[in-house]
Amino acid sequence: MELDIKAIMERLPHRYPMLLVDRVLDIVPGKSIVAIKNVSINEPFFEGHFPHHPVMPGVLITEAMAQAAALFSFTDDDGGLKCDSAKTAYYLVGIDEARFRRPVVPGDQLRLEVQAERLSRAICKYQARALVDGQIVAEAKLMCAIRSLEA
């Protein structure tokens, strides 16, 4: 199942400049998600990282993988919205074994591949990787917490 930017924005609270997923190519319920981020020279972080040699910060590549994981968690088996995203927070609470293999530069298309390792109502663990042109540029184990915003 695919998600366009409208469906992504229904599920994630992130907005420019922190929305780092442009399209979801596939979701296999309970298993995995594949999404993309088109990296443009117009990204605000390129202004200072680095002006004469623009490179996407690794922390933002990791955030893009975490946003893909959140989209996976907020999408039910039929492709619908699993919960009210306005009343639910999805926090990145752990990053293990993060590796950055090569720079991501303007013009690249990040392919975000996230596999579920453990899913529960409160904590989810994932194996994530980002690829450009079929080559792994980053990978990490992610742990995310799902919290209700209603007190």
Swiss-Prot record:
The keyword Lipid metabolism applies. It is found in: Cytoplasm. It catalyses: a (3R)-hydroxyacyl-[ACP] = a (2E)-enoyl-[ACP] + H2O. GO terms for biological process: fatty acid biosynthetic process; lipid A biosynthetic process. InterPro entries: FabA_FabZ, FabZ, HotDog_dom_sf. One of its GO terms (molecular function) is (3R)-hydroxyacyl-[acyl-carrier-protein] dehydratase activity. Its main location: cytoplasm. CDD domains: FabZ. The active site is at residue 49. It holds the Pfam family FabA. Signal peptide: none annotated. It comes from the Bacteria. Keywords: Cytoplasm, Lipid A biosynthesis, Lipid biosynthesis, Lipid metabolism, Lyase. Its EC number is 4.2.1.59. One of its GO terms (cellular component) is cytoplasm. Involved in unsaturated fatty acids biosynthesis. Catalyzes the dehydration of short chain beta-hydroxyacyl-ACPs and long chain saturated and unsaturated beta-hydroxyacyl-ACPs. Belongs to the thioester dehydratase family. FabZ subfamily. This is 3-hydroxyacyl-[acyl-carrier-protein] dehydratase FabZ. It comes from Bordetella petrii (strain ATCC BAA-461 / DSM 12804 / CCUG 43448). The gene is fabZ.
